[in-house]
Curated annotation (Swiss-Prot):
Organism this protein belongs to: Xenopus tropicalis
Topological type in the membrane: Peripheral membrane protein
Every Guanylate kinase-like domain range: 737-912
GO biological process assignments: chemical synaptic transmission; epithelial structure maintenance; swimming
GO cellular component annotations of the record: anchoring junction; apical plasma membrane; endoplasmic reticulum membrane; neuromuscular junction; neuron projection
Protein's name according to its UniProt entry: Disks large homolog 1
SMART domains membership: GuKc, L27, MAGUK_N_PEST, PDZ, SH3
Keyword Endoplasmic reticulum (UniProt): yes
Signal peptide stretch: none
Pfam families in the record: Guanylate_kin (PF00625), L27_1 (PF09058), MAGUK_N_PEST (PF10608), PDZ (PF00595), PDZ_assoc (PF10600), SH3_1 (PF00018)
Primary location class: membrane
Superkingdom, taxonomy of origin: Eukaryota
Amino acid sequence: MPVRKQDTQRALTLLEEYRCKLHQTEDKQLRKSIERVIGIFQSNLFQALIDIQEFYEVTLLDNPKSSDNAKPTEPVQTINTWEYSSLPNSTATCETLPSSLILNVEKYRYPDDDITSQEPSSPHMLNDGRNVELVQISEKNISQKENIQGLVSHSLISPLKTPEADTPCPPIVPVIPVIPVPAESNVIPSSTPQANPPPVIVNTDLETPAYVNGTDAEYEYEEITLERGTSGLGFSIAGGTDNPHIGDDISIFITKIISGGAAAQDGRLRVNDCILRVNEVDVHDVTHSKAVEALKEAGSIVRLYVRRRKPVTEKIMDIKLVKGPKGLGFSIAGGVGNQHIPGDNSIYVTKIIEGGAAHKDGRLQIGDKLLAVNTVCLEEVSHEDAVTALKNTSDFVNLKVAKPTTMYMNDNYAPPDITNSYSQQVDNHISPSGFIGHPLPPSPGRYSPAPKGMLEDDDLTREPRKVVLQRGTTGLGFNIVGGEDGEGIFISFILAGGPADLSGELQKGDRIMSVNGVDLKSATHEQAAAALKNAGQTVTIVAQYRPEEYSRFEAKIHDLREQMMNSSISSGSGSLRTSQKRSLYVRALFDYDKTKDSGLPSQGLNFKFGDILHVVNASDDEWWQARQVTADGESEEIGVIPSKRRVEKKERARLKTVKFNSKARGDKGQSFNDKRKKNLFSRKFPFYKNKDQSEMETSDVDQHVTSNASDSESSYRGQEEYVLSYEPVNQQEVNYSRPVIILGPTKDRVNDDLISEFPEKFGSCVPHTTRPKRDYEIDGRDYHFVTSREQMEKDIQDHRFIEAGQYNSHLYGTSVQSVKEVAERGKHCILDVSGNAIKRLQIAQLYPIAIFIKPKSVENIIEMSKRVTEEQGRKTYERAMKLEQEFTEHFTAIVQGDTLEEIYNQIKQIIEEQSSTFIWVPAKEKL
């Protein structure tokens, strides 16, 4: 029977009544499904479908004058009304249209269909179970071979010629696919079981179907409309045909949601969402720059069509554990404010400790999500709360756990292999109080059918096996331990990307039996190291997986390290004693990732460049105990960090190798780029700086300007070579707004944006000059005009200027007093000066917020500044690297980003964080 509007209203009422009766937890999924059906019923497009159905049943089928030769005027008028209506994104499917409406319309088929075209007199039914095709027509009147782009669920569409191909085509009527309904409703007989199928972009000009990673059953789709705010859309992207973000997938991915931005306020966009379309621009198969351009040119209202993987289904399980000598025997990560997986506040199991309660029980696995411990809920709690709940348990512990029921096979979109991810999230071992868990350096992770923690020992052969490695630039790519008292030589760490990692045949816990035929079963550590070092380019290793022996050896080493730490603390030995310095605060001048330091004696502490650390125990020469200091106070977590001495020792040892290699190649004709490569290293490890060289190469002032850069530098620029590690700091109260110095590419655009967007917070100072005043200029507004050149020269010599130079025989400069005047008015003074001015401001007790914009690459510079050539981009990049080498220790923060918008948002956040009344300033005492 035909469907009428009153039928849909009745169905809608019944559905809403039924939904209101669903109160049980187990009805949650059903309730969500019903709400989706109700949403479809209430949509404008669904109402339009009902109108078309009524039009078809009442007007066309019941009209006696309807024929092929004489068409009634009423249907034509109605169709014309629909054609020019304001329905957004008018879409149509030939399969759902009555044949009387598609008589002269081009027909479409699947390339692999054997079914012949339907006769015009019979409605086109879909009985093969295919997903409904949602086709978007780009033109109102479609002719053969025109460019037609559509949104389809799983297949390419192509035009099929008809005898009437040359005749004009009537307009396509907008309809939508129908959702599944009970059989008795029968809105459209034999319609497919999927409603509004998630589309992917395809083009009919293609000869093969478009590539889609995964199936529609694995994805969900959403259209999100954002209003561009003052700080943009508030998210970052990565990917594209020229720079795949995940594996070989060329899609455009959301990599970051910026706090306070338009996307964050809207709340629907998520990290790892894939953008398919921006307004009407298809971005599923474009370069990164094209996607950025589409977002920039999208206007103030931006409509995003995104795809995301559906959440992994989970199985809930109750596990009862009995605490053993090692406590519960597992580690956790995650929580509110410390997400283990982006966008997910859950608490995850990240390690199962061998021999512990969880390991013996066998049910808890890496990747499991903890929902509750005893009666304490662990959903949407902080990491600290979860740790407290687990530690405050008795000997018998009930865990409520969610286990993923979906395993990903070779899938780039799979959740991270959290057994082995190099995560900087806090990772806590649940062990008896007083025992500090020792996180071993993880081996490089790969996606696999099941997390490595789920593998039983039986899955790994215990027989000796032969492994052949080719030595690379990083050596063989693994560390060894052991060799004392005949305990054997074990692999303790595998370097990500090294030969051992790439072979996939060695793992932590392997015992090395021989190297190139040299027996190492009873070798000392030195003998084993020598055998590996002298093994040549091709190295044949016989290894045997011995996890129990390695675990015992690891426990022994851990105990020894703990004893050494305790004895050094009690004896007070070391370069810095806590009895002498009860409270030592330092600023980190490098990034530190505890997972990449194989020598940690106990739980490490991650930090980044610019972080403030409270060193609570500096007694040991090699390791310090510290906690992080944030704007909200000191963190409760205490971890181990490398001491200043250890940082410098490791870096200098590395530099000896670098210098040796440089001399072997020869130093003649070295370009600046060669010198930079020799002397400048990533912030991921501390910087080495040659002060003599940096002094000679420093030149931030235009060649026509004579700078006084060297006059105040002699006191702190020596000839020695040193490594940047930590800077001692003190907390100081200030009653002024700190000046802001931004260095690096795009600094001018950032400076202008800050002043124009926040004129009440930022300002500029008035410079001084000895040149005569021009008629239109006002003294004190445009410049401070100095009549006596001798007086200005004297002020420069007396350090009353933070920067000065000469241009066309006239002096120009920025005075300390001018900066103070702006600061005392409560505004941040934006200074366009060189890095030398940072130290001069500090000497004048005006501590600036100095931010360095570090470009990721030459291509990154060209992408953000479209007008620069490749040569200009290369020179800009080299200048930036030189700036970083020269002034790193004076930077408050270092920022990086793919777009200017991302960089700008980071800078605003840093300035906000650094605008407190209490600030950290360099201390006079030295480490």
